[in-house]
Curated annotation (Swiss-Prot):
InterPro entries: Trp_synth_b_CS, Trp_synth_beta, Trp_synth_beta/beta-like, TrpB-like_PALP, TrpB-like_PALP_sf. Pfam families: PALP (PF00291). The keyword Lyase applies. GO terms for molecular function: tryptophan synthase activity. The keyword Lyase applies. The lineage of its organism: Bacteria, Pseudomonadati, Pseudomonadota, Gammaproteobacteria, Pseudomonadales. This is Tryptophan synthase beta chain. Belongs to the TrpB family. The beta subunit is responsible for the synthesis of L-tryptophan from indole and L-serine.
Amino acid sequence: MTQSQYRPGPDANGLFGSFGGRYVAETLMPLVLDLAREYEAAKADPKFLEELAYFQRDYIGRPNPLYFAERLTEHCGGAKIFFKREELNHTGAHKVNNCIGQVLLAKRMGKKRLIAETGAGMHGVATATVAARFGLPCVIYMGATDIERQQANVFRMKLLGAEIVPVTAGTGTLKDAMNEALRDWVTNVEDTFYLIGTVAGPHPYPAMVRDFQSIIGKETRAQLQEKEGRLPDSLVACVGGGSNAMGLFHEFLEEPSVQIIGVEAGGHGVHTDKHAASLNGGVPGVLHGNRTYLLQDQDGQITDAHSISAGLDYPGIGPEHAYLHEVKRVEYVSITDDEALDAFHATCRLEGIIPALESSHALAEAIKRAPKLPKDHLMVVCLSGRGDKDMQTVMNHMAAQEKQA
């Protein structure tokens, strides 16, 4: 496997090796083919790229900083840890990088209505935000379980003018919300644009979302070059569907000196049935229009994912991650709920930054690795979102711990 083979994908059929593709209903096939054509044309259009750059700068607030986490570094006593500060974006997470790109594409295609799925609510908020900015009606599908644990984001979406449809099917989480959004799309193909929030779904979504998120890695390369005069030694990011990770990783896939680590949600532990680690605990199968690693039982039924973090609570993973796992370019590990919570508290106390519980999984892995590494090792952690949305979850967890004590 030569280095140049890590970054070419996907092929014309949307495949990364044997992963990805377009497994969709016949009614949707013309739509995804049309979307792929439109996206290729937009990518080659200087006017589209200029408009995208304008919104990235003046609306999202990019570039965001690459911040040296000095006290966390001292605390760990090893590698020099940097945070890529995606939580400082408008709307508080990396999700908006992708939403602004897709809404510009929807506008270019003459679509009049946006739909999206959301888990933690951050993609829903980002979609509702861009819908408001461009004056488009917007329907967000959200699992009833997630609505319960993400009240603040639900209210934000409503304030921004979005309609929220609670999904009670299945476990009432992200997978079920995505199923409902796909059903809506099939019924409203003419005027509706489905704004998928992660590097999953049928081609061209995994590649398109990755491309809109790849600004994370491009900025990181330039910023670290300026600060340290060289490439990072390692990159760490959390992986649910995997868009913040793909955004950071893609720029460095062909740099053999850069070690890349994706962190899955280990829940109560990958040895239990309460986790969301598709690569460490799943097998290949087809879900939501693409072939990838999935959590499923012996009959091929999708099993429930569990994570303390709503944004990682998905039983699959983006197909490009599945490919990078198989060719061993990226190392995928898992972090438990408890380890993520410890890292969450440490980052609050040491750096004065309240990270999202999703990002806390990446921070936990960084805290684990850093002490074993030399002091000149440069480690970049993607701080994918801020933790405001997780206050209730953390409060509940702390209250439960106090009761046990």
